[in-house]
């Protein structure tokens, strides 16, 4: 069997890659021509060995040369192994190693081979260092998303249970909190569903991979939708705040329906096409790797657009806020401090931090820049939900006032109930009309008008945000 000229060229290029790996480590080795000759001799010996061997009578995986190593016939439901190919420039380091591959129950070879024992050991040191960094980043974002999930759930309950906090602004906050929670839950669930085969791909590891593949891809789709919804709700926050400060008139309740449609409907417009194209043209593994960058840009482009629009809204809001502070004739130091505080408050709400590394694509991020981009984005994205819940719920003056009022009413109801249980029956008849067990006298000074609602002026809304 002869090798075509095109295949020879491809093989020479791949073998040059092996030489480059060796050159990077500072070792001596053969030229590309010598390495190709060694590979060609290894291939011929493999074919001669397989031709001389007698095929097994029963079901078995066929012996073959997979362009890397020579495989003998293998029994079904077993893990075959072959010695590391001797044409490798670093073969003397890995002579005792093996390449592993699964032979399925149907007599077909599995898709994956494990050649980690045959890799250049000097090259593996850099790989292990990178893997350690990625594992630490995963621990960091797991802690961040878990903390965000817990605080967001509590903030969501507070904004939902206290009726006096119900207004368009807080309805949008509730949906934003929900999108952060869905994003955190989806990412944490995806990590659980993503199989992690060990260095030796045995029967059990491959079976677990095949069983979890469908669930893992489903989790990947849900994750992409939740991430997209999170960005669109950040955009809704920016559009709503900008409309309060710039636009005049209009029904907030009517606009809220459009906000709902934008926040939860827009992500489907780019996630569904991505799923279709990915299934047709890059249906590999768990869809966690993006080898075809054009397909990944179907999702990346709308997200970058939301980041850019929110950044422009952020700049516009800062300009409006600065003009308002100056018209109040505040001292220079006072309005600068107020502007700085408002800026830091708006950054997590609008996701402005995303613009720092937005121009840097995955293709451009290499080496230290790649890890700097990953660390910056992963840290802020995972803890962003926690920051938003703290800034716009837990330390919000309206929320704190309502919690104190609710706690005061709860204690008052409890004390009234205890007093009424101790009084004789005639004491109940002496109570004023309209009072009774479990009822709390209300004060007109605590009317709902004391809290900013949908009809308040834009300046008061800005105060509540900043």
From Swiss-Prot:
<keyword id="KW-1133">Transmembrane helix</keyword>
<feature type="topological domain" description="Cytoplasmic">
    <location>
        <begin position="243"/>
        <end position="254"/>
    </location>
</feature>
<feature type="transmembrane region" description="Helical; Name=5">
    <location>
        <begin position="294"/>
        <end position="319"/>
    </location>
</feature>
<dbReference type="GO" id="GO:0017046">
    <property type="term" value="F:peptide hormone binding"/>
</dbReference>
<dbReference type="GO" id="GO:0004888">
    <property type="term" value="F:transmembrane signaling receptor activity"/>
</dbReference>
<dbReference type="InterPro" id="IPR017983">
    <property type="entry name" value="GPCR_2_secretin-like_CS"/>
</dbReference>
<protein>
    <recommendedName>
        <fullName>Gastric inhibitory polypeptide receptor</fullName>
    </recommendedName>
</protein>
<keyword id="KW-0297">G-protein coupled receptor</keyword>
<feature type="glycosylation site" description="N-linked (GlcNAc...) asparagine">
    <location>
        <position position="77"/>
    </location>
</feature>
<dbReference type="InterPro" id="IPR000832">
    <property type="entry name" value="GPCR_2_secretin-like"/>
</dbReference>
<feature type="disulfide bond">
    <location>
        <begin position="46"/>
        <end position="70"/>
    </location>
</feature>
<dbReference type="GO" id="GO:0051592">
    <property type="term" value="P:response to calcium ion"/>
</dbReference>
<dbReference type="GO" id="GO:0002029">
    <property type="term" value="P:desensitization of G protein-coupled receptor signaling pathway"/>
</dbReference>
<keyword id="KW-0807">Transducer</keyword>
<comment type="function">
    <text>This is a receptor for GIP. The activity of this receptor is mediated by G proteins which activate adenylyl cyclase.</text>
</comment>
<feature type="topological domain" description="Extracellular">
    <location>
        <begin position="279"/>
        <end position="293"/>
    </location>
</feature>
<dbReference type="InterPro" id="IPR017981">
    <property type="entry name" value="GPCR_2-like_7TM"/>
</dbReference>
<dbReference type="InterPro" id="IPR001749">
    <property type="entry name" value="GPCR_2_GIP_rcpt"/>
</dbReference>
<dbReference type="GO" id="GO:0009749">
    <property type="term" value="P:response to glucose"/>
</dbReference>
<dbReference type="GO" id="GO:0008528">
    <property type="term" value="F:G protein-coupled peptide receptor activity"/>
</dbReference>
<feature type="transmembrane region" description="Helical; Name=4">
    <location>
        <begin position="255"/>
        <end position="278"/>
    </location>
</feature>
<dbReference type="GO" id="GO:0031018">
    <property type="term" value="P:endocrine pancreas development"/>
</dbReference>
<keyword id="KW-0732">Signal</keyword>
<dbReference type="GO" id="GO:0007189">
    <property type="term" value="P:adenylate cyclase-activating G protein-coupled receptor signaling pathway"/>
</dbReference>
<feature type="disulfide bond">
    <location>
        <begin position="84"/>
        <end position="118"/>
    </location>
</feature>
<dbReference type="Pfam" id="PF00002">
    <property type="entry name" value="7tm_2"/>
</dbReference>
<dbReference type="GO" id="GO:0048678">
    <property type="term" value="P:response to axon injury"/>
</dbReference>
<dbReference type="GO" id="GO:0007190">
    <property type="term" value="P:activation of adenylate cyclase activity"/>
</dbReference>
<feature type="transmembrane region" description="Helical; Name=3">
    <location>
        <begin position="218"/>
        <end position="242"/>
    </location>
</feature>
<feature type="topological domain" description="Extracellular">
    <location>
        <begin position="363"/>
        <end position="377"/>
    </location>
</feature>
<keyword id="KW-0675">Receptor</keyword>
<dbReference type="InterPro" id="IPR050332">
    <property type="entry name" value="GPCR_2"/>
</dbReference>
<dbReference type="GO" id="GO:0007204">
    <property type="term" value="P:positive regulation of cytosolic calcium ion concentration"/>
</dbReference>
<feature type="transmembrane region" description="Helical; Name=2">
    <location>
        <begin position="170"/>
        <end position="189"/>
    </location>
</feature>
<feature type="topological domain" description="Extracellular">
    <location>
        <begin position="190"/>
        <end position="217"/>
    </location>
</feature>
<dbReference type="GO" id="GO:0120022">
    <property type="term" value="F:glucagon family peptide binding"/>
</dbReference>
<feature type="transmembrane region" description="Helical; Name=1">
    <location>
        <begin position="139"/>
        <end position="161"/>
    </location>
</feature>
<dbReference type="InterPro" id="IPR001879">
    <property type="entry name" value="GPCR_2_extracellular_dom"/>
</dbReference>
<dbReference type="GO" id="GO:0016020">
    <property type="term" value="C:membrane"/>
</dbReference>
<dbReference type="GO" id="GO:0005886">
    <property type="term" value="C:plasma membrane"/>
</dbReference>
<keyword id="KW-1015">Disulfide bond</keyword>
<dbReference type="GO" id="GO:0006091">
    <property type="term" value="P:generation of precursor metabolites and energy"/>
</dbReference>
């Amino acid at each position: 069997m002869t090798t075509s000229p095109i295949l020879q060229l491809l093989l020479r290029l791949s073998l040059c890659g092996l030489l480059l790996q060796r050159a990077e480590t500072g070792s001596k080795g053969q030229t590309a021509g010598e390495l190709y000759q060694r590979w060609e001799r290894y291939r011929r010996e493999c074919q001669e060995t397989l031709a001389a061997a007698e095929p097994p009578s029963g079901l078995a995986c066929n012996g073959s040369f997979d362009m890397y190593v020579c495989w003998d016939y293998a029994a079904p439901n077993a893990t075959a192994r072959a010695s590391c190919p001797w044409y490798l420039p670093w073969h003397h380091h890995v002579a005792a190693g093996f390449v592993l591959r699964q032979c399925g129950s149907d007599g077909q070879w599995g898709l994956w081979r494990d050649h980690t024992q045959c890799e250049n050991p000097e090259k593996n040191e850099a790989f292990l260092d990178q893997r350690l960094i990625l594992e630490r980043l995963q621990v960091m974002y797991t802690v961040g998303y878990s903390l965000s999930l817990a605080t967001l759930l509590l903030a969501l309950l507070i904004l939902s249970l206290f009726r006096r906090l119900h207004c368009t602004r807080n309805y949008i906050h509730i949906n934003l909190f929900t999108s952060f929670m869905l994003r955190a839950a989806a990412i944490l669930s995806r990590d659980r569903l993503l199989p992690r085969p060990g260095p030796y791909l045995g029967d059990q590891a491959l079976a677990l991979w095949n069983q979890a593949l469908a669930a893992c891809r489903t989790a990947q789709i849900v994750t992409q939708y939740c991430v997209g919804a999170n960005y669109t709700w950040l955009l809704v926050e920016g559009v709503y705040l900008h409309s309060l400060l710039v636009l005049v008139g209009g029904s907030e309740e009517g606009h809220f329906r459009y906000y709902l449609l934008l926040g939860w409907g827009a992500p489907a417009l780019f996630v569904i096409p991505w799923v279709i194209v990915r299934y047709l043209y890059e249906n590999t593994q768990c869809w966690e790797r993006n080898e075809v960058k054009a397909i990944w840009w179907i999702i990346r482009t709308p997200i970058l657009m939301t980041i850019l629009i929110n950044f422009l809204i952020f700049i516009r809001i800062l300009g409006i806020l600065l003009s308002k502070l100056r018209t109040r004739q505040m001292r220079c130091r006072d309005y600068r401090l107020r502007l700085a505080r408002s800026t830091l408050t708006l950054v997590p709400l609008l996701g402005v931090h995303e613009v720092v590394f937005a121009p840097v694509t995955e293709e451009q991020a290499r080496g230290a820049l790649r890890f700097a981009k990953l660390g910056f984005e992963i840290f802020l994205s995972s803890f962003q939900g926690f920051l938003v819940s703290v800034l716009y719920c837990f330390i919000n003056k309206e929320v704190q006032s309502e919690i104190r009022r609710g706690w005061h009413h709860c204690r008052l109801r409890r004390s009234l109930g205890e007093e009424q249980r101790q009084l004789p029956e005639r004491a109940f008849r002496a109570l004023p009309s309209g009072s009774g067990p479990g009822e709390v006298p209300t004060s007109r000074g605590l009317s709902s008008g004391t809290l900013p609602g949908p009809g308040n002026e834009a300046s008061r809304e800005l105060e509540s945000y900043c």
